[in-house]
Amino acid sequence: MTDFWSGYIIVLALANIVVVAWLLMWTRKMDLSEMAEDGTTGHEYDGIKEYNNPLPRWWLICFWGSIAFALGYLALYPGLGKFQGALGWTSHGELQKDEAAYDKQYGPLYASFAAKPIPELAKDERAMKVAGRIFANNCAVCHGSNARGGSGYPNLTDNDWLYGGEPEKLVETLTNGRNGVMPAWLDSMGEQGVREVVAYALSLSGRKVDADLAEAGKARFGVCAGCHGANGKGNQALGAPNLTDTTWLYGGTQKKVLETVFYGRKNRMPNFAKTLGPERVHLMAAYVYSLSHK
């Protein structure tokens, strides 16, 4: 924050408090010379007259108390531009304090989990209970509370993996995240070309399709083979899905597959290296591993 904006915020905040205090003093009682003979202010509407009674004392005390609280808060805590407050408190510092206390209490537990190989850890009932809570807080929002995923979010309970389901691959995915891209083919292939390729792609998994369309699509499939392979079985190094099974990330209906090839797809799996740290990443990899090895 620049000095100008810091000063601007300080002046604006304090000026607001001063104006409110002045307004309270100015309106607390009307000048007696302006009062009508009947003790009213002279204001009347629809038969209702306004009397010049003093503000309730409890209300005044609360109002002045709120002003005092505001000034005290701004003196002790951040709120006036660059001024950090007399206590030097920051939310970042509070977070670090809480994290340090958490690591002190649970660090040895996670260290004991990290010492075990993932296949062995996946069978540790206590470890999986802890991991289940971490999953609920960090992963369930996308993959679902039952880990079965949804449209665009992989099912973690089966044995179909875009980037590989080996322990080291799961750690890699959780640590670095993934960025999946499927290019759009409508402009380069045209609508008819896309329909032909989709017919062929669906035939690879045993679906009933128009034979002529599928045959024409087979000739065009060469541009897809660069990622999905000549046999359509995919490539885990690229995250290219297997087209010969019945697992479809965005839906396997003809309409959904056409939509995918027409317009492409972009998907992102966030990384958890900083959020969880290596020990909890190891634990979560074991949890995900356990879901498909029951």
Residue ranges and their predicted role:
Residues 34-37, 117, 142, 156, ...:
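Residues at structural and domain junctions
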